[in-house]
Amino acid sequence: MTVEQLNPPLLRVENLGLRHVSPAGPTTILSDVSFELGRGEILGIIGESGAGKSTVGNAILGLLSPEFQQTSGTIEFDGKAIDGMTADERETLRGRRISAIFQDHTASLDPLMSVGAQVEETCLAVDKTLSRRAARARAIDLLARVGIPEPERRYRNYPHQFSGGQRQRIVIAIALAGSPDIIIADEPTSALDATVQKQVLELLKTLVDETGVSVILVTHDMGVISEITDRVLVMRKGQVVEADHTAVILDQPRHDYTKKLLAAVPRLRVPPTTMSSEDGNVDGGSGRPADIGDDDLLLVAEDVSKQFSRPDFPWGLGAAKASFGLSDVSMRLPRGTVTGIVGESGSGKTTFGRILAGLSTATGGRVTIGKNAFDVSKSGRRNGLLGRVQMIFQDPSVSLNPRMTIAETLEESIRFGASAGSSDMQADVSKMVDRLGLARSLLGRRPHQLSGGQKQRVCIARALLARPEIVVADEPTSALDVSVQAEIVSLLKETITHEGMTMVFISHDLAIVQEMCSSVYIFRNGRVEDYGSSEFIFSRSNHPYTRSLINARPQRFTC
């Protein structure tokens, strides 16, 4: 008897082929995809957008829409072909023996149900023999297992009352409700910050060790792959180009595409830390920047605050509660520099950037650009900020009007920006797209006809064509694949040098911030926790929160 017969794989995918049928004709999505998953194993599937990695997971789960057709191969679970099962058999399999964790925890949870009720509902759905009391007890146990504090009390809370990391833990609890044999985790940490990502990955690893569940981890992040996977499949254009143990993939990649992915991962450089506290603030969030000569300053933000008022329930019932998104945040931005803002979700970094750009109002404080002070309690159209500050947003697909051609989008930026009245808008647009590496043939297309990297280049061009004094870039690379990230970072650096641009660069990726920025502010819970030169923050700051962010970075890509 062979080793494979003694320890048969839990899941076997062999020569899987899929195509998508549309009025334009069939398109091959997957071609000859083969792999096995053992019991208690974590298998990583990595590749860029469009590689087919999520499609593999959906094929296993039986979640593909009718226009997808299987053209070849088989999918076997525990010795039985999944693709030969009836719809009822697949329904029984899904949730009970194979579960899924998806990227967007917000979309995975019902905002009108308490989180406990959602876990309890899943427990009842996968085990019809459970009483309501037993299902509630199991739901509380699951919330405790995934690390939700005070699960009995928080059982009654709604999704909006939890942090992003806690919501993802709740989604994991729901996935565990049926005691599955396999969890397919599709980009489960992509929307999370470094410290929260590390916590979620450690939780998945602990669950594998404790329960023996197998995990298929779909991601485009080599850092995630390096942290917890046992083996890796590298996919490109619907095919597996390389497969091996994780250590072999990371240390001895054979395929050029794998080498390209590894080379594109930004490295965080952390020299040996000293305990010196000069050249920056390490006293824990006074928010007061170091002195900079007034002649060198372009922007000064002083004691900017933002207070939110929201009801305790998502449908507007109950007394409104006040919470601070920002509390007395100050910043001094030297002319011609790039200043980074780093922080976890909910730290207030995007709120602050939107106030600087005139897209949100503040409840206190003031902003001065040059010699002009702006009333940030008013909207950007009323206080004059709009146009002087432009913003590059995180998701280019959302920030571009799908009904406008690229040329129309860029010309609109000229009409409403500081360069309004330009005698030849078409010439200005053509020069800009040339400089940003976009083909002029793309100008007649609409956003859905462009790749993610091309769309983000358009967003950069749109911001620059308005001739702003300051650009606020809010997570401009986090929605992009790692190789495209590297291209956009390189492009931004070239543009900053060429234009003499002043930029606020918002990110939770410390390696990119280190590469881009001359000074860095660390945000937490709406306050400035730490700040200083980039060299100080990454080499010499002894602030515990700053160190925790740095230590959360995958060690494989820290040097």
Residue ranges of predicted features:
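Helix-to-loop junction immediately C-terminal to a conserved catalytic motif
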Residues: 61, 65, 357
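Conserved ABC transporter NBD signature motif
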Residues: 69-81, 365-375, 385
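ABC ATPase NBD coupling module
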Residues: 82-99, 117, 125, 132, ...
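Conserved ABC ATPase "signature" region
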Residues: 134-153, 424-441, 550-551
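Conserved ABC ATPase signature
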Residues: 157-162, 166, 446-450, 454
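A short, proline-enriched helix->beta-strand linker immediately N-terminal to the Walker B motif
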Residues: 177-181, 465-469
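ABC ATPase "signature
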Residues: 240-245, 252, 528-532
